Amino acid sequence: MDTRAKGSPVLVYNPAAYSRRSLVEATVDLPAEAEGVAVYAPDGKTVPAQIVARDGARATVLFAAAMEPVSYAVYDVRAGKAGKGKVLRASGNTLENRVYKVTLDANGDIASVIDKRNGRDLVEKGKAFRLAVLTPNVSNRYPAWEIHKATLDQTPEPVDTDVRISVAECGAARASLKVERRYGDS
């Protein structure tokens, strides 16, 4: 196996019997002054990549990898400008890529999912995908996974106290929002 690389070689293995496209996270040595990361696929083309954590000259990087079934490949991680990914945006209460635009309401619930291909909102107007708690759960034997119908028939309690929404990350490989809420004493 040839692991020669101009930067840090990262071996990626796909044990599955089907092709996969996935994000890979690896910790590598990068110069402390490096502001970005460039990751090269085996064909020499850059792939979407970003630095997600730093500790001096150690960096945790995230990059997009495409793998054939039951195979491995060596990716080359170097300091530099990241390969451009598909358009990813995270700002305020919105996440967006080339296919979907997701908007959160003030409670941090999903208020809208626009399918850009069809120009259609997948969430009914005035509704939202909400985080809620079903209480009390009357199951004594398997309360972690057994939810009785009587519990499901009750109105769930909303989780909408002290809501804070912030951008967790917005890079070439991944974008995300962080929603923090309080429920009871948690």
Where are the regions a protein language model picked out?
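Catalytic and substrate-binding regions of extracellular carbohydrate-active enzymes
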Residues: 1-186
